[in-house]
Amino acid sequence: MQSSSPSTSHCSQIPIKIQHHIAKKRQVRRRRVDLDCGCSYYIHLDCINHGFTHRGVHHCASSNEWRLYLRDNKSPIFHDNQTQPTTIQQQIQFPNISNQVQPQLEEGTGDSQMFSQLPHLDDLTVSDWSFFKSL
């Protein structure tokens, strides 16, 4: 006897309850990270390029972010958490140039070249104003 189903594959579909049961048994791929303050958190292994701040300290969750955070000079594996990093303040040196202000053009009360063709604003009709408002 032929099947009334138009499908050519006659495999049975797994019930949703069974699928959920299998998914609950599957191990979550995550790794535990212990922080210096005594706190710990878990990060999913597929989660990359995410960092966060905890108690005022920025924590990186990816090697790329560590390298950026350490300015590419030291691998995060060899990062020594015992020593306090010295703060390097770079002061930007601006040349001390006095009296070199670029002069501005004076404002005039006459027509500019761009608006010389426009009629006086008092001469505009209601239809002109409605046209401008529709723009």
Swiss-Prot record:
Q: Where is this region: Transactivation?
A: 120-135
UniProt motif (Nuclear localization signal) ranges? 17-32
Where is the protein localized?
Host nucleus; Host cytoplasm
- Give a Pfam family name: Gemini_AL2
> Where in the chain are the unnamed zinc fingers?
37-54
**PTM per Swiss-Prot/TrEMBL:** Phosphorylated.
Q: Which GO terms describe its molecular function?
A: DNA binding; structural molecule activity; zinc ion binding
Task: Report which superkingdom the organism of origin falls in.
Answer: Viruses
A GO term (biological process) for this protein?
Answer: symbiont-mediated suppression of host innate immune response
Q: Which UniProt keywords apply?
A: Activator, DNA-binding, Host cytoplasm, Host nucleus, Host-virus interaction, Inhibition of host innate immune response by virus, Metal-binding, Phosphoprotein, Suppressor of RNA silencing, Viral immunoevasion, Zinc, Zinc-finger
- GO CC term, one of those recorded: viral capsid
User: How the protein assembles, per its UniProt entry?
Assistant: Monomer. Homodimer. Homooligomer. Self-interaction correlates with nuclear localization and efficient activation of transcription. Monomers suppress local silencing by interacting with and inactivating host adenosine kinase 2 (ADK2) in the cytoplasm. Interacts with and inhibits host SNF1 kinase. Binds to ssDNA. May interact with host RPS27A.
* Function in brief: Multifunctional protein that modulates host antiviral defenses and promotes host attractiveness to insect vectors. Acts as a suppressor of RNA-mediated gene silencing, also known as post-transcriptional gene silencing (PTGS), a mechanism of plant viral defense that limits the accumulation of viral RNAs. TrAP suppresses the host RNA silencing by inhibiting adenosine kinase 2 (ADK2), a kinase involved in a general methylation pathway. Also suppresses the host basal defense by interacting with and inhibiting SNF1 kinase, a key regulator of cell metabolism implicated in innate antiviral defense.
Q: Which family does it belong to?
A: Belongs to the geminiviridae transcriptional activator protein family.
Comment text on domains: The zinc finger and the transactivation region are involved in PTGS suppression.
Q: Which protein, by its recorded name, is this?
A: Transcriptional activator protein
